[in-house]
Amino acid sequence: MPVTKPYFVTVAVLLILVDKTTGGLFGLRSGKRREPWVSCELYQGSCRNACQKYEIQYLTCPKKRKCCLKFPMKITRV
């Protein structure tokens, strides 16, 4: 009988962890809908139809939009 108490505690902890993990049990998707990952956000860009004159296009975003990154400008006086 003393073995059953740690067994039930272990099962309870595992069930709580499975509920709290994002992927669910064995990486299966839960009922929560996640937004698709946009690689443009990794570089702190923004998805637009056209880039501004101070921006450069680096990647492509979903729906055929452009990933616009701010062009690093260093003004030096000569």
Swiss-Prot record:
UniProt KW Secreted keyword: yes
GO cellular component: extracellular region
Signal peptide region: 1-23
Disulfide partners: 40-67, 47-61, 51-68
Entry keyword set: Antibiotic, Antimicrobial, Defensin, Disulfide bond, Secreted, Signal
Family assignment from sequence similarity: Belongs to the beta-defensin family.
Role, per record: Has antibacterial activity.
Protein name as it appears in the record: Beta-defensin 29
